């Protein structure tokens, strides 16, 4: 489906851990547009936190709408990764957020699932510091492949 997509992984302290924009031309938009995307996603975080209590699934489709943009989210269960002897509140630990201008629920859900599998591998890396930015070129490439497979034509 043709459309514009902005994907972000938001950390425990509402910090951006990873960001990626996808559009028809596969080029980055201006900085102003990027800041607007970040603002819309950040504004929708409270709605995601409220919505996750009303469902048993991890995928939350169209949690919010801003003009022509929809916000979808994926709230993965990550508590099993941390050693159980340490207590951390992981109920709102990491959230995957997608800002998009076309309805593509199945594609976005499948994209989230593929990226989640790759994200788990990043978290299992002993050199990755939890809640820090993901700078791996390999992770970036796998996210792009998942996008081409599920949300881009």
Curated annotation (Swiss-Prot):
Keyword Mitochondrion annotated: no
Entry keyword annotation includes Endoplasmic reticulum: yes
SUPFAM superfamilies noted in UniProt: SNARE-like (SSF64356)
Top-level taxonomic group: Eukaryota
CDD domains in alphabetical order: TRAPPC2_sedlin
Gene3D superfamilies xref list: 3.30.450.70
UniProt keywords, alphabetically: Cytoplasm, Endoplasmic reticulum, ER-Golgi transport, Golgi apparatus, Transport
Entry's localization field: Cytoplasm, Perinuclear region; Endoplasmic reticulum; Golgi apparatus
One of the GO biological process terms: endoplasmic reticulum to Golgi vesicle-mediated transport
Cellular component terms (Gene Ontology): cytoplasm; endoplasmic reticulum; Golgi apparatus; nucleus; perinuclear region of cytoplasm; TRAPP complex
The protein's assembly and partners: Part of the multisubunit TRAPP (transport protein particle) complex.
Annotated function: May play a role in vesicular transport from endoplasmic reticulum to Golgi.
Similarity comment text for this entry: Belongs to the TRAPP small subunits family. Sedlin subfamily.
Protein name per UniProt: Probable trafficking protein particle complex subunit 2
Organism: Nematostella vectensis
Species classification: Eukaryota, Metazoa, Cnidaria, Anthozoa, Hexacorallia
